[in-house]
Amino acid sequence: MMDNERKVIPYRIKQARVSRGLSMVELSELVSVSKQAISQYEMGKNAPSKAILNAIATVLKYPVSFFYKPVPANENASSAVFFRSRKTAKVKALNAAREKIEIFREINDYLEQYVDFPMLDLPKITYEDDGINPIDNEQIEKYAMTLREHWGLGNGPIDNLINIVQRNGIMVSKMQLRLNKLDAFSVWFDNKPFIFLSSDKDTNVRIRFDIAHEIGHLLMHADYYSEEDLKNAAIHEKLENEADRFAGAFLLPKESFSKDVFSTSIDHFIQMKAKWKASIGCMIYRCDTLGILSSNQIKYLKDQMTTRVYWRKEPLDKEMPVEKPFAHKQAIVLLLDNKIITPGQLVEETGCSAEELEQYCFLDKGTLETKKDSKIIALKASKKQQKRSV
């Protein structure tokens, strides 16, 4: 269908702008129109000319097809979005993340037309809410062990957490937000859980902790708290505390992890890091939570961390391979290899640039490059074929 036969979807202009963290004034200056014009485009009171739409698409780095794409009927999340660092994150960053969540959900829905992702397999738990007060450690340990048992993980270290999470039907993506103060976040969409990781996190132990933290939110909090609840700083702090403790309990089970803690030497904790694939800081926090070590021993460990400048950059961070999301990558490669879709078709129909699709779906760089045919020589038709065509 030609562009002049299609109608621009006003919401898509707003969605694209907000996802890039821009105000209407900022976008208007970049495309040389008034703020009022942008407002009218977004409200559907006026449609941008083809030239202005092309300028908006270029500035916001979306294919023009994005602005013609119908909005799904079920565009709203079915749970609150659980953001880490909500207190210090700017409203622009939170709103940009929300729009990117919606866009990735649509990419996921598009792929589900062609492939079957793993079915969701999460246990149901009864969350023991205690108002503003965080639930106790015993209950957190119980939730973490319930999930381990449900997934058949035993009590030992978890090898590849992203692999396990995706095989059990949780969608995982990485986002290039280019906005500070946001780590990971999670949400339910139509009974499907999504976890989004910040591309700024580049160490495996931190990525694993973020995933475990978000699983805690999806498992414990999604059915009980609304977006309005999360605006309450005390409630948000409570839920973050619970998700942190869940992550520690899930990654480092009380019984088996405790047996490995027989020294307060940082060098011993480095050895444990290699085994458990958890940061030294996380393990110190876990020892404190479980009461494995005394307050003086915890202080001694923290002092060693400070002396060695390990709080920001720990030993083994570079040596440990980073676990990567793969489900959507596998789906796209499968479709491309079997010529079900082309790279150009994927870009056109999802309304996302090749670069952004590669980021969302963790594709190898260049996977969606459209290679031009370099062949300029063709065989002549045979004389028999020429006669037939006459």
Model-found features: residue ranges?
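Active-site hotspot residues in diverse enzymes, especially metal/ion-binding acidic/histidine motifs
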Residues: 1-390
